[in-house]
Design a protein with these regions (language model features):
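Periplasmic alpha-helical coiled-coil/stalk elements that build and connect Gram-negative outer-membrane
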Residues: 17, 21, 45, 132-244, ...
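Short terminal targeting/anchoring segments
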Residues: 180, 387-409
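Bacterial Sec-pathway N-terminal export signals of envelope proteins
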Residues: 12-63, 69, 217-260, 341, ...
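Sec/SRP-type N-terminal targeting helices
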Residues: 34-38, 51-52, 88, 102-130, ...
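Acidic, low-complexity, intrinsically disordered peripheral segments
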Residues: 406-434
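A short glycine-centered flexible hinge/capping loop motif at secondary-structure junctions
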Residues: 172-176, 383-387, 424
Length: 434
């Protein structure tokens, strides 16, 4: 009794997750998304004025050096040879050096623009990862519901077969049914029981897949979801989806950004044909210590500066080759963008057609299920009266189960089309607001 109370209490306290809660948990914990966010942070860190070359560089340096020498000098007047051994001189330097590029053919400003574009590309890549994860979690969430409903249908099939087996067994014992009827009912019951057990495995596999997307530590734990049916949106409009896709599709936005990056790469090559102006300045102190001679030490403190002006005159035509290749890359980026637009339009047309077709199939299967249930009820009444054979009863049962399965499949397929339409149009994050 105590065990039952504890189990009941644990079941009552089990967390029930809505789709939005699953999405929020996945967006917070998914490892692939965390990696992409780290990559975005790298591109954010790189998009700085200093990395582009707008800011000067300053170095603080210090140096110590010494020399030990033995000298031998022959005097011109007296022909005397003077030897000095162990002459030890020392030099100490310390200073600050400043370098600044004043002009480099617009290379610095173009580099900064490229870094900002790369930063935006990193944000787009993160958005793509988020949209893929939202679509993946949503699809698996409803697949889990699909597997739960299918398990319920199989359980219902087992109950029907069990009831049929009970009726046949009773009538077989009193001689109303043959042994063949009894054996067939038993085979059908075992077949439905086997299908039920296999469906339990499919449900567990879906739970594992959903837990993996949510980055949960324990993957093999069933998850309780709030929804018990698959509701589909039937109000989507093609014109709105097309317009939204052309404006918001992340893959298309990424292709457009690639075109801008290709143009900036070309400008960087062109900038190398301009002259450059660089400024350098320094301020430091130097101390020399002498072991011999009239001076014991000498120190100097001061500044130095300079301006360097230069220009690339000839580099073996490599720069010209690189500019030509950069132009080709611009054309390729434009073609890839156009190809991406065509591919997305084609995908949208195909998914839309599948979506509309599945909506019609869904309505049809709802009607079929009503008819199949009515047929089963009539068949069951005739079977109980002995006017229907076991095989005919089994066919009525299979007709009902098949109708339930077709309706379930149509519902899930329509939901997948809905998810794909929202994703391709850049609106899949709307599931976060449900």
């Amino acid at each position: 009794m105590a065990c039952l109370l504890l189990c009941g209490s644990a079941f009552a306290q089990e967390k029930v997750y809505t789709l939005q809660e699953c999405l929020n948990e996945g967006l917070q914990n998914n490892y692939s998304l965390k990696i992409q966010r780290n990559n975005q942070q790298v591109s954010d860190n790189n998009a700085t004025l200093g990395n582009a070359g707008f800011l000067p560089t300053a170095d603080l340096s210090g140096r110590y050096s010494g020399s030990s020498q033995d000298t031998e000098t022959k005097l011109r007047d007296t022909r005397e040879i003077v030897k000095e051994n162990g002459i030890f001189n020392q030099t100490i330097d310390a200073g600050v050096n400043l370098n600044f590029t004043i002009f480099e053919g617009f290379n610095v400003s173009t580099t900064y623009k490229k870094l900002k574009e790369l930063q935006g590309q990193g944000e787009l890549n993160t958005r793509i990862a988020v949209e893929n994860l939202v679509a993946g979690i949503t699809a698996e969430y409803y697949n889990y519901i699909q597997q739960q409903i299918r398990l319920k249908n199989f359980k219902y099939a087992v109950a029907l077969s069990k009831e049929r087996l009970r009726v046949v067994e009773q009538r077989y014992r009193i001689g109303n049914f043959s042994g063949l009827d009894y054996q067939q009912a038993k085979v059908d019951f075992n077949s439905d029981s086997s299908a039920f057990m296999k469906q339990q495995e499919a449900l567990q596999s879906s739970a594992i897949a959903l837990n993996e997307l949510l980055a949960r530590e324990n993957l093999n734990v069933p998850i309780a979801v709030a929804d018990t049916s698959i509701e589909v949106a039937s109000e989507l409009q093609f014109e709105h989806l097309m317009s939204s896709m052309m404006e918001n599709n992340t893959s298309l936005l990424s292709a457009r950004r690639d075109s801008r990056l290709a143009m900036l790469d070309y400008k960087l090559k062109v900038s190398q044909t301009y002259p450059y102006v660089r400024l350098n300045a320094g301020y430091g102190y130097t101390l020399n210590k002498y072991n011999k001679g009239a001076n014991y030490h000498r120190g100097s403190l001061g500044a130095d500066f300079g301006v360097t002006i230069g220009m690339n005159i000839f580099d073996g035509n490599n720069l010209r080759r690189e500019r030509r290749n950069a132009k080709i890359n611009i054309e390729n980026a434009r073609l890839e963008q156009t190809d991406m637009e065509q591919t997305l339009k084609s995908d949208l047309y195909n998914i839309w057609q599948a979506y509309r077709n599945n909506l019609q199939v869904l309505d049809l299967e709802k009607e079929n299920l009503v008819t199949a249930r009515l047929n089963y009820e009539i068949a069951m009444e005739r079977y109980m009266l002995g006017d229907l054979s076991g095989i005919e009863m089994r066919e009525a049962q299979k007709s009902l189960l098949n109708a339930e399965e077709r309706l379930l499949t149509a519902s899930y397929n329509t939901k997948l089309c809905e998810i794909s339409l929202l994703q391709i149009s850049g609106q899949v994050q709307a599931y976060l607001q449900l």
